[in-house]
């Protein structure tokens, strides 16, 4: 289902957005570690590294085709539904964009637990019902994800989310990003 062509189309479609989001992150959300969960070929990871190569950065991706075509060496093949054995580091930003709709809903808790256990701030989005897309088996209303994160001790940072979305809307962006994305912090 997720061929090399699928991942290449993500790179092509989302490259300008990845550039803008990396600009936003490096200017507005200081971090010493950047983790991208479900990173495909590492497009966003690579753009962060171009702007701040001194931070530790790692991307986790399940699909063989994506990992073998990775844009940077920091993409690791990993099934996010399994416990991620990594030590939590201070000041870690996690990114998880449009991943959970590709994972059976029975596995939402281990995935969000992995993300929650390793991050101090999270930028998250997941496809809404009716959004369309390849392999979408778990499209849910945004409020469902908000409640699930809340059950793990997270809340939306409304000011940071608004600021990020305003920045992204001022230039190239994918429609799903401004509809679905949010910044979460520990409550």
What does each model-found stretch correspond to?
Residues 1-90, 95, 106-118, 129-132, ...:
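Conserved N-terminal segment of class I S-adenosyl-L-methionine
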Residues 102-103:
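A short His-aromatic
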Residues 99:
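Hydrophobic adenine-recognition pocket in adenosine-nucleotide-binding enzymes
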Residues 121-123:
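Short glycine-centered segments of the SAM/dcSAM-binding site in methyltransferase folds
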């Amino acid at each position: 289902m997720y061929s090399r062509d699928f991942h290449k189309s993500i790179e092509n479609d989302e490259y300008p957005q990845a550039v803008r989001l990396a600009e936003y992150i490096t200017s507005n959300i200081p971090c010493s570690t950047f983790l991208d969960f479900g990173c495909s070929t590492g497009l966003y990871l690579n753009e962060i590294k171009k702007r701040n190569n001194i931070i530790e950065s790692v991307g986790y991706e399940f699909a063989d085709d994506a990992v073998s075509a990775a844009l940077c060496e920091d993409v690791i093949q990993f099934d996010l539904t399994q416990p991620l054995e990594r030590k939590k580091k201070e000041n870690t930003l996690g990114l998880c964009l449009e991943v959970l709709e590709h994972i059976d809903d029975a596995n939402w808790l281990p995935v969000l637990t992995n993300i929650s256990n390793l991050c101090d701030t999270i930028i998250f989005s997941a496809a809404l019902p009716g959004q369309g897309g390849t392999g979408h088996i778990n499209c849910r209303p945004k409020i469902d994800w908000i409640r699930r994160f809340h059950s793990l001790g997270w809340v939306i940072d409304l000011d940071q989310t608004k600021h990020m979305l305003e920045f992204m809307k001022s230039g190239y962006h994918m429609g799903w990003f401004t509809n679905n994305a949010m910044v979460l912090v520990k409550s």
